[in-house]
UniProtKB/Swiss-Prot annotation:
Annotated Gene3D superfamilies: 1.10.8.60, 1.20.5.170, Nucleic acid-binding proteins, P-loop containing nucleotide triphosphate hydrolases
Source organism phylogeny: Bacteria, Bacillati, Actinomycetota, Actinomycetes, Mycobacteriales
GO molecular function: ATP binding; ATP hydrolysis activity
Xref: InterPro entries: AAA+_ATPase, AAA_ATPase_domain, ATPase_AAA_core, ATPase_AAA_CS, NA-bd_OB-fold, P-loop_NTPase, Prot_ATP_ID_OB_2nd, Prot_ATP_ID_OB_N
Keywords assigned: ATP-binding, Chaperone, Coiled coil, Nucleotide-binding, Proteasome
Biological-process GO terms, alphabetical: modification-dependent protein catabolic process; proteasomal protein catabolic process
Protein's recorded name: Proteasome-associated ATPase
GO cellular component: proteasome complex
Pathway: Protein degradation; proteasomal Pup-dependent pathway
Length: 615
């Protein structure tokens, strides 16, 4: 190779064989490439004209632009290829997932030291192995587990949430099994799931007691409803008895004796019957005196029977707190308000079962010495005299159930039964005898003095009073309210023509005029005051004059009497005699004496008719 050729080769970027240390074959190939490069350079020099420099620069720019475009396109193709690869992998995973064999489920019965478990699945009890990912020691009896196609436990689930409802009869001695009663009184032994067993072994300070209804778990007791899987033979959960919850209202009422007006004598009677035995148990034991088991409050409607029962529970709780040295604000007592008519059920035996559950709950809450009052409102609706049923004979079994609960073999301690009724003559005599409902208190209609006391509970000094009425009594608000009450009571109880209501004719020919006052009640007095307050509000809106006036109360009395003119339209004569309380004769004829009534108001009373409001 000449010196000039070596120089050209260096300019082309090639090295000589001696410089590179190549083999003879590589050197020959390199020499061939040099010749080709020289020939191409010569062709290029021959082809380039005068404007070759400008054209070459333009071609370079075009090539660079094309290279950039191809590079961007290549990047997009790479991204598309990557996304397609990811989608392909996802589809492959989905195909693999869809192609997996189905998994089965079972209920864990027991676990063993060799990491095997007993599982109930597909109606069979089987011993299976567990996946290495499963902590066998963490599995709990009754828990749901997932099995693969090889019947290996691969996942631990929760406890079963659906099943049949059975009633707990008793827990067996081992503490892990229970006797339950299902449909058609079918008895069976079931295992208790881990949550139920753990509650049974909790310390007493971590378990809700009979007197507490908080969120803490409580131990099982006979009568509880359990969620049971009859096939697996497991009870998983305690289900609250909603049917009894709807019938029973557990609370400490906020009504005190000071909220009740016109019933001083009746309040004293019921306090002697209910509070003394609880507050002075030692004296009762010293005199061998048995506390009463029940109290009957009877009388016309709207006169405060339910109010007295609530006040008894409130007062009893506070007095017991004082005796124990507890805070009166945290006093505990229970007032089980039984909605009488809702106890009735079309299925035979259901009403009796509800009564048993109610008294069972009362005994549980009274076991810690906390007073419990079981209040039956409208007692005549469910405990009527046996044999008097027209369309059914349900009372023939309901009444004996109550009798056995009150004074049966299993006695009641710290439980008082209070019944309220405005048809005491319909209650079975066996319930009213001494030893059951010992104390019978009549809640009478208020007289003028009692009416003033009741008005004072609703007309208080905090109410806004009209300036004109205040000025009449020298601006003394207390005197103004007192005068209002006296005037409205005098108007309500005055034996004037405007207050005449009915003329009653008895079977012996005697006649008696009955006034609206003979049908007055605490509820009517409250309605009169509420109506007067409404008139005062309308007066503010219409005339701008603020405050309650005596005239508002007097107008309310007139309107209240007018609304009651047509109410006693179909009434049994014997009931009318009992309401009036003056004659024992049977009523054969009544005549309304309300001003403006036509002669059509005169009517004879049929002895077989429905009952009016006032009974």
């Amino acid at each position: 190779m000449s010196e000039s050729q070596r120089h050209e080769a260096r300019e082309d970027g090639f090295t000589t064989p001696h410089e590179s240390g190549l083999s003879s074959e590589d050197a020959a190939e390199l020499e061939e490439l040099r010749r080709e490069a020289a020939a191409l350079r010569e062709q290029l020099e021959n082809a380039v004209g005068p404007q070759s420099g400008l054209r070459s620069a333009r071609d370079v720019h075009q090539l660079e632009a094309r290279i950039d475009s191809l590079a961007a396109r290549n990047a997009k193709l790479m991204d598309t290829l990557k996304e397609a690869r990811q989608q392909l992998l996802a589809l492959r995973e989905e195909v693999d997932r869809l192609g997996q064999p189905p998994s089965g489920y079972g209920v864990l019965l027991a676990s063993h030291e060799d990491d095997t478990v007993d599982v109930f699945t597909s109606g069979r009890k089987m011993r299976l192995t567990c996946s290495p990912n499963i902590d066998v020691k963490a599995l709990k009896q009754g828990q749901t587990v997932r099995l693969n196609e090889a019947l290996t436990v691969v996942e631990a689930g929760t406890f079963e949430a659906v099943g049949e409802i059975s009633t707990l009869r008793e827990i067996l001695s081992d503490g892990h099994r229970a006797l339950v009663v299902g449909h058609a009184d079918e008895e069976r032994i079931v295992w208790l799931a881990e949550p139920l067993v753990s509650v049974e072994h909790l310390p007493d300070n971590e378990v809700a007691g009979p007197e507490l209804d908080d969120d803490r778990p409580r131990r099982l007791r006979p009568g509880d409803s359990l969620l049971v899987d009859t096939k697996a033979g497991y009870a998983f959960e305690r289900i609250p008895k909603a049917e009894v919850e709807d019938l029973v209202l557990e609370e400490v009422p906020d009504v005190s004796y000071s909220d009740i007006g016109g019933l001083t004598r009746q309040i004293e009677q019921i306090r002697d019957a209910v509070e003394l035995p609880f507050l002075h148990k030692d004296l009762y034991r010293e005199y061998s005196l048995r506390p009463p088991k029940g109290v009957l409050l009877y009388g016309p409607p709207g006169c405060g029977k339910t109010l007295i029962a609530k006040a008894v529970a409130n007062s009893l709780a506070k007095k017991m707190a004082e005796v124990r040295g507890d805070d009166a604000r945290e006093a505990k007592s229970y007032f089980l308000n039984i909605k009488g008519p809702e106890l009735l059920n079309k299925f035979v035996g259901e009403t009796e079962r509800h009564i048993r559950l109610i008294f069972q709950r009362a005994r549980e809450k009274a076991s810690e010495g906390t007073p419990v009052i079981v209040f039956f409102d409208e007692m005549d609706s469910i405990f009527r005299t046996r044999g008097t049923g027209v369309s059914s004979d349900v009372e023939t079994t309901v009444v004996p159930q109550l009798l056995s609960e009150i004074d049966g073999v299993e006695g009641l301690e710290n439980v008082i039964v209070i019944g309220a009724s405005n048809r005491e003559d319909m209650i079975d005599p066996a319930i009213l005898r001494p030893g059951r409902l010992d104390v019978k208190i009549k809640i009478e209609r208020p007289d003028a003095e009692a009416a003033q006391d009741i008005f004072s509970k609703y007309l208080t000094e905090e109410l806004p009073v009209n300036e004109d009425d205040l000025a009449e009594f020298g601006g003394d608000r207390s005197l103004t309210i007192k005068a209002m009450i006296e005037k409205v009571v005098d108007r309500m109880y005055a034996e004037i023509d405007d207050n005449r209501f009915l003329e009653v004719t008895y079977a012996n020919g005697d006649k008696e005029v009955m006034y609206f006052k003979d049908f007055n009640s605490g509820a009517m007095i409250q309605n009169v005051v509420d109506r007067a307050k409404k008139y005062a509000i309308k007066s503010v809106l219409e005339t701008g004059q603020k405050g309650l006036r005596i005239q508002h109360l007097l107008d309310s009395i007139v309107d209240e009497f007018a609304e009651n003119e047509d109410l006693p339209n179909t009434t049994n004569p014997d009931d009318w005699a009992r309401i009036s309380g003056k004659k024992g004769e049977r009523i054969v004829y009544i005549r309304t004496l309300v001003t403006g009534k036509s002669s059509s108001a005169n009517r004879a009373i049929d002895t077989e008719s429905n009952l009016g409001q006032y009974l």
